[in-house]
From Swiss-Prot:
Name of the protein: Deaminated glutathione amidase
Catalytic activity: N-(4-oxoglutaryl)-L-cysteinylglycine + H2O = L-cysteinylglycine + 2-oxoglutarate
Coiled coil regions in record: none
Domain CN hydrolase: 1-253
Lineage: Bacteria, Bacillati, Cyanobacteriota, Cyanophyceae, Synechococcales
Length: 272
């Protein structure tokens, strides 16, 4: 692992696949021009509409998204963490996986994860979200991809961040960097987003790269923004605020080693 710049992109995706991919391309280009070697895209970057719309277009979204990610990685010679996007479930009409993927600069897929924790909640602002109505939960733990260049990358998606046992599993598999792409609601995000990300970073002494959605996507769907990169001590290295853009910061193996030596909590676990 070497020091490198990572970027967490922040988008306002809408129910328009073509426009969303165009926005994503512009932000990837911006990140690469600023020196990023690892670029993260938020949950629902390719399409953010209601669940019925998303399911009706799931095959088209998945096909276009996979081609787009391969093309972007090759064109910009950058590693891309992307998720999630809908991927149809074979033999299950009316269901798709919420999928994250890791793409190498040559366009090869290095890792894939289907979100296991589905967002079925009644938010106090009056909105109800029932992800399981159209999304099939993944059945496997998320992967940790072991990279000589970028460290060990652990995948997750949005609502997963509320389940610390998932990230403890990733840390036990050697994760150095935790990927948390999200479309956090505006209501929950203002109180929970930053706290949860810092907690996952601190308790696992890992970097966190958290791309995000922001703003108004369609009627009654507003997201929090604040894409972030956080160091293993819980320090916020970059915050994209509330407008589309990016958070960019250095991932440094010396800092990772320093924190783990100064606060060796992973070595002190009793209940493992």
């Amino acid at each position: 692992m070497k020091p490198y710049l990572a970027a967490a992109l922040q988008m306002t995706s809408r129910p328009n696949l073509t426009e969303n991919l165009q926005e994503a391309e512009e932000l990837i280009d911006l990140a690469v021009r600023q020196g990023a070697e690892l670029v993260g895209l938020p949950e629902n970057f390719a399409f953010l509409g209601n669940e019925t719309e998303k399911l009706e277009q799931a095959t088209a979204i998945a096909t276009a998204t996979e081609k787009f990610l391969q093309t972007m990685a090759q064109r910009f010679q950058v590693t891309i963490l992307a998720g999630g996007f809908p991927f149809p479930v074979a033999g299950e009409a009316g269901k798709a996986y919420n999928t994250a993927t890791l793409i190498a600069p040559n366009g090869q897929e290095l890792a894939r994860y289907h979100k296991v924790h589905l967002f079925d909640v009644n938010v106090p602002d009056g909105n109800t979200y029932w992800e399981s109505a159209t999304v099939m939960a993944g059945q496997k733990y998320p992967p940790v991809y072991h990279s000589d260049s970028f460290g060990n990358l652990g995948l997750s998606i949005c609502y997963d961040v509320r389940f610390p046992e998932l990230y403890r599993y990733l840390s036990r598999q050697g994760a150095d960097v935790l990927f948390v792409p999200a479309a956090f609601t505006a209501y929950t995000g203002k109180d929970h987003w930053q706290v949860l990300l810092q907690a996952r970073a601190i308790e696992n002494t890992c970097y966190v790269i958290a791309p995000a959605q922001t703003g108004c996507h369609y009627e009654r769907r507003h997201t929090h923004g604040h894409a972030m990169i956080i160091d293993p001590w819980g320090v916020i290295l970059a915050d994209a605020g509330e407008k589309p853009g990016l958070a960019i910061a250095e991932i440094n193996p010396d800092r990772l080693k320093q924190v783990r030596q100064q606060m060796p909590s992973l070595q002190h676990r009793v209940f493992v």
